[in-house]
């Protein structure tokens, strides 16, 4: 749980109603992790629940036990909203792609992602973001390096000194890659074990 707030950890640990963090509910290509991480920011630590009553109960538990603060979303409050429509063809003029088309998730989480990323365009660099903002003032832009230009004209970016800890999304992808490697190693071991067994069987018959 490195990088996860104390309150979010407590909510996940102590409430069966917590479905997990938003970071665990989405699938992001490796080359877009920096962009999506920057765009979602603290929303990656959203604790996802199905119902508003569950979210309320978790908040009460955190407050009464002084276990920290957390941001919690109730999926039942998100139905019926409209997803902003982005003309993909016009984005090609400055090398942009709609973020929603690049990030995967399960159907029940999609309304949340629609609201968080529905107006977001991923672009190659800040120059492309500025060109895009001039033509589409109702959209937000993020570069692949994680620099933001909001529809309000606000830039966000830069880097601090030292090495920042790996992002939630990057760690999630690393874990998935390791699990695949372990699965592959397990299959290799099983194959060698079968071959060894076959050889031993042949030697026995001889």
Model-derived segments and spans:
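Hinge-like oligomerization/junction regions that interrupt long coiled-coil arms in large cytoskeletal
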Residues: 1-191
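Extended alpha-helical coiled-coil "stalk/arm" regions
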Residues: 190-206
């Amino acid at each position: 749980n490195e990088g996860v707030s104390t309150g979010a950890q407590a909510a996940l640990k102590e409430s069966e109603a917590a479905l997990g963090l938003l970071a665990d509910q989405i699938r992001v290509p490796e080359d877009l992790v920096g962009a999506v991480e920057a765009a979602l920011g603290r929303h990656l630590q959203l604790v996802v629940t199905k119902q508003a009553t569950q979210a309320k109960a978790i908040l009460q538990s955190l407050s009464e036990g002084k276990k920290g603060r957390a941001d919690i979303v109730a999926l039942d409050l998100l139905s019926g909203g409209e997803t902003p429509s982005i003309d993909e063809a016009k984005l090609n003029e400055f090398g942009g792609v709609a973020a929603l088309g690049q990030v995967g998730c399960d159907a029940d989480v999609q309304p949340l992602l629609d609201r968080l990323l529905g107006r977001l365009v991923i672009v190659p660099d800040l120059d492309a973001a500025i060109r895009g903002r001039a033509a589409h003032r109702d959209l937000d832009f993020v570069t692949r390096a994680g620099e933001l230009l909001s529809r309000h004209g606000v830039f966000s970016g830069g880097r601090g000194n030292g090495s920042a800890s790996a992002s939630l999304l990057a760690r999630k992808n690393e874990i998935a890659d390791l699990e695949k490697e372990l699965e592959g190693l397990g299959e290799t071991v099983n194959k060698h074990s079968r071959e060894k067994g076959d050889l031993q069987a042949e030697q026995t018959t001889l």
